[in-house]
Amino acid sequence: MFNIDEFKEIAEKLPTFKSLPNEGKYRTAIGRYYYCIFLKLREIVKEIEQDREDGIYELLNSGKAHKALPAYFRTLSDKIRVDNLKNDLITLAEALEDLRKLRNMCDYDVDVSISFTKVIEAEIDIEIIEQTITNLSYQKPKSKTKIVGLKNVLEYFKDKDNLPTYNEVINIMYRRR
């Protein structure tokens, strides 16, 4: 199985290669940062969703996955009443959306100049997301038990049958903001 962190390693090292053209290496580094974190998040959610039969797993394996993943976290945040968890899920979705916009600009907008500053923006987004994956937590109601880590929190809500449904995610994906 491919080690997704290799994308991050490439993204970190690529801008330091003096023999390569600056803008090309900056654009490529940003793309590798995006795919590193997108694939990490997608694999976490797919593992949780693999035995549910409402279509989320299939959605995450489709071309719509890039919109579906942040919508999944936004949908889950809408279901939660705990402010810190709700805010962390929104932050996760927003950072992923920001990183995707930056990656799309790098891949498709050839008239825009991409500087090293944009690579730093991507690094900040990936750091926010990685910290959230690790530190996201949920305090069970009327309990001293604290659930820590994105995967563990998703498993808890899966056990409570409170994960986003396919229709909820689709609605978030296509609603106007």
UniProtKB/Swiss-Prot annotation:
It comes from the Archaea. Gene3D superfamilies: Nucleotidyltransferases domain 2. To M.jannaschii MJ0628. This is Uncharacterized protein MJ0992. It comes from Methanocaldococcus jannaschii (strain ATCC 43067 / DSM 2661 / JAL-1 / JCM 10045 / NBRC 100440) (Methanococcus jannaschii).
